[in-house]
Amino acid sequence: MTDKTEKVAVDPETVFKRPRECDSPSYQKRQRMALLARKQGAGDSLIAGSAMSKEKKLMTGHAIPPSQLDSQIDDFTGFSKDRMMQKPGSNAPVGGNVTSSFSGDDLECRETAFSPKSQQEINADIKRQLVKELRCVGQKYEKIFEMLEGVQGPTAVRKRFFESIIKEAARCMRRDFVKHLKKKLKRMI
């Protein structure tokens, strides 16, 4: 027996670990350490530090004189002050004046792309929210009634909407709420 204990003490490679044990710290501990490292080194990284220092210099206005700032902007865009196109890295103009090619049709196309939602989309959103509220535990009927008032369209659409919500409320075992909805439906008709 003493030979085995001496062998284990001398040669740790023969010792088997349990599957749960590992050399690295636990997942939660690693996450905490990573979070602490991020908090401590938030402004210490090369990229963040250089960007922050440039931002601070630009905000204070002490780092770059305005004349150099204009030339740097021109280098970035490729245009000089006389609107001539330039090659990057040189100040020699390439030639020709650059003009804008916007027309009124382009602006109209962009305006129509941001049209408001249709009645059907609005009603579908309201229905999703209503079903979500119905499935929640509790009696928050005021919020549901406010959403039902937001339904858009003719009376027939509103009637179908109320009927579908009544069915959903019955399915969710909300008998008292079904009674309230039926009363509102009768008043609406």
From Swiss-Prot:
Testis specific. Expressed in cancer cell lines. InterPro entries: INT_SG_DDX_CT_C, Integrator_subunit6. It holds the Pfam family INT_SG_DDX_CT_C. PANTHER family: DEAD/H BOX POLYPEPTIDE 26/DICE1-RELATED (PTHR12957), INTEGRATOR COMPLEX SUBUNIT 6 (PTHR12957:SF2). Belongs to the CT45 family. This is Cancer/testis antigen family 45 member A2. It comes from Homo sapiens (Human). The gene is CT45A2.
